[in-house]
Amino acid sequence: MAAAAPKRRMGLEKIGLYDVGRAIGKGNFATVRIARHRIAKTKVAVKSIDVSKLDKENLIKLEREVKIVTMIDHPHIVKCYEIMRVDNMLYIVSEYCSTGELYATLMGKGRVTEDIARKWFTETAAAVSYLHNKGIVHRDLKTENILLGKDSKIKLIDFGFSNFQTPDQLLNTWCGSPPYAAPELLLGNSYDGMKADIWSMGVLLYILVTGGFPFGSESVNDLKRSVLSGVVKIPYWVSVECADFIRKMLVLNPTKRMTIQNVLAHRWMHIRNDVKKQVQNLESSIRPTPSKLNPTIMMFMQQHGKWTEEQIIDAVLGRNFESPIFATYELLADKVKIGSLEGTGEEYPRRGSRGSILSGRANVDEQPLTPTISAHQLAQLNLSSPDCDSDDSSNSDLCDESPLSSLEPNHKQFTLPRGLDLMGNRFENRRHTLCASEQLLSPNLMGQFPPPNLLLNNFTMSPLGFPPMPEGQAAEFPFPSLHPALGAFPTTDLSKMLPVPKSERRASAGETLLPTNFDLQQHLANLSANPVSFPTVEEEGRSYLAKYGGKRNTVHCLGNQIGGGVQNPIPRYQRTPYAKAPPAERRSSWASPSLSQQQQSHLEKIFKDALQTNNDISRLHKEFKNLSHGCAQSQITNEGSSLACPQISITDEYNRQHNIAPSASSFDPVSIFQKNAQEVVFGQRPATAIGFSSTSFSGMSTPEQTTRSMDDRVRSIVCTLPFAEVVEELKSSLNILKIPFAETQEMVYEPQVTEMRRLSLPSGVEIGVAVLPPEHKSHVEFAIINNDSPTSEILCDQLICRLRMIDPNWSSE
């Protein structure tokens, strides 16, 4: 193994003060590799980009990413340490998280509980709130861009698509991942980046609590149709508060979508913690630019980095990310922050006593001219941990190209390095407790130990530590100190030692509770040689009936013919006393399967007596006959077709699957273009266990009955273009949007015979185009059948805008 270490070290690429190893991620233009700082002995992630392969637009995005990562500092955002430019390569050195992506954790463990989801989502929301307050939008929030750091803390990464945005500004660049993209991005419209981040956060929370995506699809077109439908199906195990939270973030209309302040104030976020206080604590924990540097770190850097004090102060206070001095100081400061060493505020510790209060004299010892680093402080800076290694074993981790090292980074701290013996390396798991390599005992104490006896090297020792004796002669050394070979070694009198404890131990020693080998043999010897006999199924049944047969709800007796045995085994589902009873024998609580003739005649007599008397029962009987006769006659219309009965649905999912509205039987879309109806009243949607969701046909997003005027649901426009041209333009626009429709041709007879063309959309929009005979114009009406479909309103606005663009002489009705 000693010869293998230099070989591995030769495979490390040296970039600046870093030993760069294996790749842990790849993108379109960049590669991320794990590296190790040679002075701080800390693992970092190095993102390398070949600038020569980028065009002008991507170069602008890269410089914008560098500007953003160097101006943010948050506990739940991966920290940037250094920016290096070497020839045509740009290197971004950032914090390394060994646990891996949140996506890999969810793929391995599935959905998490709402408590864990609340913790992770709160930390993500705190990071997004920090970015939005600085005028930065991420635009690529997803599980792949969220890492888990120490103690499962969220770390947000990848600011390649980030941008600056003011409150009154809209963005136009399409970016991000389609499953997390907001509907305004899928439509290609200008969008608010902060509202797009809120939509991605809603998808993220849905994935955490359900383990799947809210909009399932096999292609981008299917995804677009699923998102624009506005239907979000939430499983039953999600709480009402969480379901309401998800629906308010996944609102199609961005103006009605939540802001980051609304997200932090939602009641689901405050179930088990105070989110506002937690966010304030996170913001207060952000380390500002120090006005005075830590003298211990500065001394350590001067000894190992050969930098002067002025160079260190200028680079750190100026936050020069392109200087290795700033990165070294930040890495060492993070290590000191983890430990107990913090800046004391004084350049050197005060020495001496405070003196006498009466005399007013203070006895202060003279301070040394040259400050020194104590062993404890040096141990803090040389601290070893899974992310901060100080030995050569970390090089094997940097060079290991095995798939396990890249796919399962969280298993490294539980396994031993390759090629090391288990017993010889048993204490390596506690390397973080080792301090600096200095002499732990003073020379005075070392001088008190006797020098080693050189004569021991000339003796052939036995396994027990004593020289072999001649055959037939026993060793007669009553005390170990009388042994001739143990001259100057200190010995211990075994008679003064504590007695060996018995096998009685504390309850925490679990192995003592188990029986010994002798106890097991004695127990097996006492067992009988005869096998244990168990009762058969028939014997169990008879015993059960003998004990509980007198009860009211049990079988009275067993039949004479009982199957079973070896030849005819009883099926598993029939091994119960109730299955053994013959059909004639029943429970006492069961009703009779048939009526006797005497019982039948008695019931008929009671029925006739009740109808002969003029009482309430007879009147109800007559009214029931009349109602049933009337319903039977009116059930068939003149055309011979039966009317469809209104179906009652109890869940939103049933309504969406079968396209059933609360008033589907009484609502006629054709009447919109033939009658001047003023109001349409939709019923109250039922409350479900999933929460008060907004569906395609339910009235509002809350269980309240609402009334909307027809003017809000029907929009009309008069075009001067010919009738056929308007119809073709509408059909062409729908085909471009990839929205299916059904076309029908009808005739309107009031006030005069005119032709009308109808386009029916599955989303609940009816488009009617009719001819106005006197002016030879086209009358277009858009009717929204759904009561709360923002998608339908947006679609109607787009089609009306299209008609206005091609017809400058349009007019409203």
Curated annotation (Swiss-Prot):
Keyword Nucleus in record: yes
Subcellular location: Cytoplasm; Nucleus
Positions of disulphide bridges: none
Residues involved in ATP binding: 24-32, 47
Catalytic reaction list: L-seryl-[protein] + ATP = O-phospho-L-seryl-[protein] + ADP + H(+); L-threonyl-[protein] + ATP = O-phospho-L-threonyl-[protein] + ADP + H(+)
Catalytic residues identified in the record: 140 (proton acceptor)
One Pfam family recorded for the sequence: Pkinase
Disordered: annotated segments: 383-412
PROSITE patterns assigned to the protein according to its UniProt record, in alphabetical order: PROTEIN_KINASE_ATP (PS00107), PROTEIN_KINASE_DOM (PS50011), PROTEIN_KINASE_ST (PS00108)
UniProt keyword Disulfide bond present: no
GO molecular function (one): metal ion binding
Residues annotated as domain Protein kinase: 18-269
UniProt xrefs under SMART domains: S_TKc
Acidic residues bias: start-end ranges: 388-400
Keywords: ATP-binding, Cytoplasm, Developmental protein, Kinase, Magnesium, Metal-binding, Nucleotide-binding, Nucleus, Serine/threonine-protein kinase, Transferase
Origin: domain of life: Eukaryota
Position of the signal peptide: none
UniProt-listed Enzyme Commission number(s): 2.7.11.1
GO biological process: dauer entry; intracellular signal transduction; positive regulation of gene expression; positive regulation of growth rate; positive regulation of multicellular organism growth; response to heat
Summary of the function given for this chain in its UniProt record: Regulates chemoreceptor expression by phosphorylating the hda-4 class II histone deacetylase (HDAC) and inhibiting the gene repression functions of hda-4 and the mef-2 transcription factor, enabling the correct sensing and transduction of food signals. Role in determining body size, the dauer decision and serotonin-mediated egg laying. May modulate the Sma/Mab pathway and regulates development in the later larval stages.
Protein name: Serine/threonine-protein kinase kin-29
UniProt organism field: Caenorhabditis briggsae
